Amino acid sequence: MEMVRAIDEAEQRLEGIASTTPLQPSIRLSEQYGATILIKREDMQAVRSFKIRGAYNKIASLSPDDRKRPVVCASAGNHAQGVAFACAHLGIGATIFMPRITPTQKIERVEHFGGELVEIRLVGDSYDESSAAAEEYCAQKQGIFVHPFDDLQTIAGQGTVGKEIFDATAGDVGMVIVPIGGGGLASGVASYIKGKNPAVVVVGAEPAGSPSMYESLKQGRIVELEEINTFIDGAAVRKTRQRTFDLCRRYVDRVVLLPEGKVCTTMIELYQNEGIITEPAGALALSALDDVAEEIRSKTVVCVLSGGNNDVLRYPEILERSLVYLGRKHYFIIEFAQKPGQLRQFVDDALGPTDDIVRFEYIKKTNRERGAALVGIELKDRADLEPLLKRMEQIQLNFRPLGSEELLYQYLV
């Protein structure tokens, strides 16, 4: 119950700073899953993510003496915005370390919220590398390190999301699905929800490409991943920490892993149907609904949409990954005879009525009888692939599909 009390105190500290975000019903998803699906809209915070809660609660709880020391943090973007906002509001200077992969939009937002009080340093290719540099710098300067998740005050601040969910539903909820990166949000929300009603099922949703919490819980110890996929940058963490690991092990019922293509599909669906722009990490919880579909029928389910700081310039890439995941986009290396009418035959005899060529380029210009071309084809349905392959064989095309492990494929997708 100590975390419950800490979260109650954090809520008072955050009054007038963090918004009480709405639980938005989704008619589309409720009909799809035969349940009442509510979306906790943390993208509607001033900094467009839940991170303002933990960052402000931590910094505002510093003693007068500690406030005189330099504040240091590391972040993939959203925590940095929360720290910048808090420091500007409290008049405290900060040095913020961010990975070099951080989207420009997030860097600019940090500059906007922090103003002259915040210095940004771009270091490392992942959160973990940036964090190591930040902690070393903090030790040199004898500063206060505001960790994005490995801190009880930060966790308590994030846990106010759980308090708002509980208060808004009077505890009458069957399941809460929370995204997991480092685990600060999940451990805070789960601590409060389980502390008030142990019967509520809490599910963590983590990227399949960076499953640090999943592997740690599976092995019963903190596991550091050798490699991670940083596409879902807001949740790309190589190693969780002891505090969040302990709380998640105690209060989170299980963790499901989501492939990036599934997350991209959720992002596209949210934009097309609800007009919601979310970042990849923000879509994790909603992406997990298929994994729990059978057990949530006729129940109330809350999915935490944790943030909306997404650069719209990423949407072409997001759509590409979604189409590949759905089996609707495929790439081939095709050898065409260098004679008139060969491409016309391919279009007329191989492509179906709803198949589209979305990319075509000769890999190498040649005077030989045959030339290889890279061809991208978009299908209306994944079931259209087999008929396409059969028609290509019938006209005796020499072709091969590009596999996901190939370097050229990774360049395209």
Say what each PLM segment does.
Residues 1-413:
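PLP-dependent amino-acid enzyme catalytic core
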